[in-house]
């Protein structure tokens, strides 16, 4: 019989260090469990999250109290129905399969080759700083249609926005950094928006400014910020997670090197294994029951994608990285109307361009024997360092 939510005490620091033990405890307690440090009812079960994502009338994206709104403005991620449908449609031309293949994949190849050119003469590096962060940043600058923006700047903006969106502890310094990043992005948009209005092109900003229904500058700004948040960290962290998964499973790496079509499997498994976007929030619009838990109108629920993608009721041996795992739907790109618009672009960038080039250009790639990688986060999760060596 459904009951009121259980609760547990866990700190944000503990979640950031390793959320998976907590996710397992929550799953044992109920479908939605109150975690006071997050100010959310956390949902960790695969089927419970799918149920919520299929019912946006009850589990609404529209959420006036969302941290995302406070940090980035009222974006399409916090809208439902026709309003969401229109704003999503305004960015989709930049992500069409034909546009990705014709315009973006060749540019991704050029950027990757240039970064690897700079590494080939070396014998060790931290792939986060020297490759994954600049790769994701430079590709996103191209996709957005920004000009004169350094990759280090957009990487900082993205991290500041993500930190702000996950600032459930109310840290004032984090909030100030997010505000500064938001203001800098507004300036970057202002510098190019008239150019894109006059010259239609494949970029996201051009797509927005030539949409059938005119968008306000406020709408454009908010949606660009959402794209900078998720559109940078997802490819960056999925690059690093896939490389980490393969380097810690040498037999799987051998299989991939022998059959490059398996790079796509490795990418999908990495997104499941460590979901870069690990949690997002929904507002309960009316009294309801989710699984075994009674929820009240205006409750805030955190859909823990990182937990759902390791739900043992869905995936066998879920904590293992296994590229030979039977193909099953995961939630690494979300679900329902808010399924990630950039999914194909990310699959092409990472699975078809980045991974083959890394392992081809950096022979005998392996983890650094003296500097283990570090993984952090729960709202957004991935390696924050990935020291590697190659050659001899």
Predicted regions and their residues:
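Cytochrome P450
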Residues: 1-392
């Amino acid at each position: 019989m459904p009951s009121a939510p259980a609760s547990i005490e866990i700190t944000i620091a503990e979640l950031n260090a390793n959320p998976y033990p907590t996710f397992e405890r929550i799953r044992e307690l109920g479908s939605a469990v109150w975690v006071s440090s997050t100010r959310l009812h956390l949902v960790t079960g695969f089927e419970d999250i799918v149920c919520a994502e299929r019912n946006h009338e009850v589990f609404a994206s529209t959420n006036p109290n969302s941290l995302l709104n406070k940090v980035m403005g009222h974006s399409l991620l916090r809208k439902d129905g026709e309003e969401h449908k229109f704003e999503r449609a305004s960015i989709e031309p930049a992500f069409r399969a034909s546009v990705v293949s014709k315009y973006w994949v060749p540019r991704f190849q050029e950027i990757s080759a240039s970064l690897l050119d700079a590494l080939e003469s070396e014998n060790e590096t931290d792939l986060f700083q020297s490759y994954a962060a600049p790769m994701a940043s430079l590709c996103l600058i191209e996709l957005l249609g920004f000009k004169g923006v350094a990759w280090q700047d957009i990487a900082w903006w993205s991290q500041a926005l993500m930190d702000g969106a996950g600032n459930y502890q109310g840290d004032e310094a984090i909030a100030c950094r997010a505000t500064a990043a938001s203001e800098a992005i507004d300036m970057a948009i202002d510098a190019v928006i008239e150019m894109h209005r006059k010259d239609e092109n494949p970029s996201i900003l051009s797509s927005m400014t030539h949409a059938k229904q005119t968008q306000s500058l406020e709408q454009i700004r908010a949606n660009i910020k959402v794209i900078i948040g998720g559109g940078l960290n997802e490819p960056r962290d999925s690059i690093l997670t896939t490389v980490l998964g393969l380097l810690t499973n040498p037999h799987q790496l051998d299989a991939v090197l022998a059959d490059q079509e398996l790079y796509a499997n490795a990418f999908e498994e990495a997104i499941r294994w460590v979901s870069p976007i690990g949690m997002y929030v929904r507002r309960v619009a009316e009294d309801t029951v989710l699984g075994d838990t009674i929820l009240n109108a205006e409750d805030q629920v955190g859909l823990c994608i990182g937990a759902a993608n390791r739900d043992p009721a869905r995936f066998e041996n879920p904590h293992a990285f296994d590229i030979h795992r039977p193909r099953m739907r995961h939630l690494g790109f979300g679900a329902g109307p808010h399924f990630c618009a950039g999914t194909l672009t990310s699959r092409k960038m990472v699975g078809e361009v980045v991974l083959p080039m890394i392992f081809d250009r950096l022979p005998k790639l392996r983890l650094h024997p003296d500097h283990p990688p570090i993984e952090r986060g729960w709202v957004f999760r991935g390696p924050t360092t990935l020291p590697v060596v190659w050659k001899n």
